[in-house]
């Protein structure tokens, strides 16, 4: 080009290749498939000692029939590759540049080893991080033990820094039985995509999954193997093991919860789970035993287990004859103020406590037992469905007041709701009365304990029988009828009523008395009676599936005809689809709307969960900078910096918003962010596809702008916080 300034803008620097490392890793992992080839990069660099260098850094390169001279500057085109475990530029063309590059940068991009299989850096065994997924390292196997029946083997992988026990199984891709049998203790191998996890002996071992790979490294030598076995430590402390396991399971666990929450938020599933959603009960402050409130189902108490016994109870048998046995924990818990009995079902996700343990109960309800006369007896507590019991190993209660036993005191009757939504029990009778010119009915039922409950509604229910068990709901017109799924609750006419009106109208307009068509008749006469008959048939029964491919076209025609005939007429003569459109018109989502993250929850910076999408966070910008990237011949602008609130601060790296300038000292709301972890194990947030940034009116009295010695890292340290040394 003639304009030198324009020509320079088309080329990227060598140092900026580090910025596009992640796309290169993804490319290497997926392989050089059709349609996934990298586009060629354009850059200016100087040939210096078998490397290409400019003002930002240097990188190794290879040429394919391209001749270059040392200490000369060229305009190159090429792509990134991995050659001999080093990041390399494959040059396809070189044109001498008009001006030379004088000052060269010191950063070397080809210094670290890169695994071509996973696209990640190769580390030493001593630098392996506990429970991190997808790590690669060079090692020599020793103490190899094969198990041909289970198609797996165990070995100790070692280099000159450390060793670790490994459990290798055959996968469907790269690790075959022949590969396992060919492993030799005298050779060095590259083990790719390895995860550290616990074995049956509570020790950390290296495990291989379906992505893992084992390749012989002929150009690598490990002379002396280290005896520092990382698997020698046994994690006997359940608390320490659980803290490590949470790091590995947090992504898939949060993903399951996130999918279930999105399923519950879908209006189409509202009738399935409107009674199954977990209540948003926040843990309350612990209270003393003597301060337990009666009939309050959201209390927290801490006490010492005085006595404990278990009791098995079989649930009613199912239709297939199987029955489930529940384990109930019963005993006494106390503190300095008194003691009280407890009676609750054992929870599978909570470890069982024993006598003299200090335990915290959450979502506790102070209840009372029913006597034979129907009166409420003494106190006892129960952990509700969504509560937990947690063993507090660092808490101690020395003196327990055994003289004040709350279970011996009489508990007042549970307060009744003066206006319940529904009542259930043995029907006693109904009373009719007039109020404000309207007739209303008061229905009375008797519970199993002999208590009578009443409910007053305006609807008269004629299906109730004295002495039978009924549930009377205020919101339903009938007590024991199923919902009308054909539009009755929405005020629409049912299909049978529509069909009856259509038949009467068709008889009036057409005097011909044709025989009704058979089901799936391909010849349909052009008259209203036949159309109406086929409408009725298609609505009341569905055509059976036909798996004969030779008649697929005919069956498709019949199904399409039945779909078209489901369009009924309303009272005004207009054609509408009562079966789908009217019922779901206001309950479906737009096609391009990301309804997975409609209900994002606001959280503090310290409460951001790693790997979880759809989080909202508000913070004050304490530093900001802009930079540009050349991606696919396009220049994209990005903004990175750091935001902080009262508790913590974190880095952000996002695409520059349109019509918004992010300034230091201003407060912004980051909506729908993803808390990611970089290769060094530290947090940063970026925006998801539908995320955005906008100013916030929130004010902070003080912010936490403290950071580590390395200002490039966030204050939330993923590795140091979750994994002990």
Curated annotation (Swiss-Prot):
It is found in: Nucleus. The gene is TGP1. The N-terminus is blocked. Residues 468-478, 545-564 have a biased composition (Basic and acidic residues). This is G-quartet DNA-binding protein TGP1. Residues 252-284, 468-614 are annotated as: Disordered. Gene3D superfamilies: Nucleic acid-binding proteins. A motif (Nuclear localization signal) lies at residues 241-258. GO terms for cellular component: nucleus. Keywords: DNA-binding, Nucleus. Binds specifically to parallel G4-DNA, a four-stranded structure stabilized by tetrads of hydrogen-bonded guanines. Residues 517-544, 565-593 have a biased composition (Low complexity). Residues 256-277 have a biased composition (Basic residues). One of its GO terms (molecular function) is DNA binding. It comes from Tetrahymena thermophila. It comes from the Eukaryota. SUPFAM superfamilies: Nucleic acid-binding proteins.
């Amino acid at each position: 080009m003639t304009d030198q300034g324009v020509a320079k803008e088309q080329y990227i620097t060598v140092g900026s290749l580090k910025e596009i490392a992640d796309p290169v890793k993804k490319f290497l992992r997926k392989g050089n498939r059709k349609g996934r080839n990298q586009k060629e990069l354009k850059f200016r660099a100087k040939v210096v000692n078998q490397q290409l260098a400019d003002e930002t850094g240097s990188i190794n390169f290879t040429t394919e029939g391209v001749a270059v001279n040392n200490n000369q500057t060229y305009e190159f085109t090429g792509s990134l590759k991995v050659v001999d475990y080093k990041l390399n530029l494959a040059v396809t063309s070189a044109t001498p540049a008009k001006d030379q590059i004088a000052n060269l940068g010191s950063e070397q991009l080809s210094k670290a080893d890169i695994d071509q299989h996973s696209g990640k850096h190769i580390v030493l065994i001593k630098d392996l991080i506990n429970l991190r997924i997808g790590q690669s390292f060079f090692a020599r196997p020793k103490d190899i033990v094969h198990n041909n029946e289970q198609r797996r083997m165990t070995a100790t992988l070692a280099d000159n820094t450390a060793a670790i026990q490994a459990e290798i199984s055959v996968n469907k891709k790269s690790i075959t039985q022949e590969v396992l049998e060919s492993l030799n203790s005298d050779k060095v191998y590259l083990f790719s995509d390895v995860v550290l996890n616990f074995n049956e002996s509570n020790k950390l071992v290296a495990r291989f999954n379906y992505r893992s790979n084992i390749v012989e490294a002929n150009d690598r030598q490990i002379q002396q193997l280290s005896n520092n076995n990382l698997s020698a430590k046994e994690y006997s402390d359940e608390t320490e093991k659980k803290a490590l396991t949470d790091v590995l399971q947090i992504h898939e666990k949060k993903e399951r919860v996130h999918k279930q929450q999105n399923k519950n938020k879908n209006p189409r599933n509202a009738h399935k789970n409107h009674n199954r959603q977990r209540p948003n009960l926040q843990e309350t402050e612990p209270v003393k035993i003597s301060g337990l409130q009666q009939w309050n189902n959201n209390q927290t108490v801490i006490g010492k287990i005085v006595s404990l016994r278990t009791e098995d109870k079989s649930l009613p048998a199912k239709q297939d004859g199987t029955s489930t046995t529940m384990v109930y924990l019963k005993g006494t818990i106390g503190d300095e103020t008194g003691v009280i009995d407890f009676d609750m079902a054992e929870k599978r996700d909570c470890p069982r406590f024993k006598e003299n343990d200090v335990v915290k109960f959450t979502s506790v309800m102070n209840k009372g037992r029913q006597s034979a006369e129907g009166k409420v007896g003494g106190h006892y507590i129960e952990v509700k469905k969504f509560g937990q019991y947690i063993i507090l190993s660092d808490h101690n209660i020395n003196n327990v007041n055994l003289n004040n036993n709350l279970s011996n005191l009489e508990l007042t009757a549970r307060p009744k709701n003066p206006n319940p939504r529904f009542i259930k029990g043995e029907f006693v009778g109904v009373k009719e009365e007039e109020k404000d010119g309207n007739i209303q009915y008061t229905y009375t039922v008797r519970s199993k304990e002999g208590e009578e409950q009443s409910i007053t509604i305006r609807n008269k229910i004629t299906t109730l029988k004295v002495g039978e068990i009924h549930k009377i709901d205020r919101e339903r017109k009938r007590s024991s009828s199923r919902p009308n799924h054909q539009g009755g609750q929405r005020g629409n006419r049912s299909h049978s009523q529509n069909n009856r009106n259509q038949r009467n109208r068709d008889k009036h307009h057409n005097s011909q008395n044709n025989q009704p068509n058979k089901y799936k008749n391909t010849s349909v006469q052009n008259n209203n009676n036949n159309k109406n008959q086929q409408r009725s048939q298609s609505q009341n029964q569905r055509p059976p599936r036909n798996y004969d491919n030779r008649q697929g076209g005919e069956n498709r025609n019949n199904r399409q005809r039945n779909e078209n005939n489901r369009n009924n007429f309303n009272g005004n003569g207009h054609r509408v689809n009562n079966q789908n459109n009217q019922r779901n018109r206001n309950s479906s989502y737009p096609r391009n709307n990301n309804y997975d993250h409609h209900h994002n929850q606001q959280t503090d910076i310290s409460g951001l969960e790693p790997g979880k999408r759809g989080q909202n966070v508000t913070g004050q910008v304490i530093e900001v900078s802009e930079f540009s990237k050349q991606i696919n011949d396009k220049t994209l602008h990005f903004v990175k910096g750091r935001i902080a609130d009262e508790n913590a601060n974190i880095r952000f790296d996002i695409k520059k918003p349109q019509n918004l300038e992010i300034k230091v000292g201003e407060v912004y709301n980051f909506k729908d962010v993803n808390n990611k972890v970089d290769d060094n194990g530290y947090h940063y947030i970026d925006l998801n596809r539908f995320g955005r940034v906008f100013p916030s009116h929130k004010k902070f009295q003080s912010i936490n702008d403290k950071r580590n010695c390395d200002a490039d890292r966030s204050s939330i340290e993923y590795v140091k916080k979750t994994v002990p040394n």
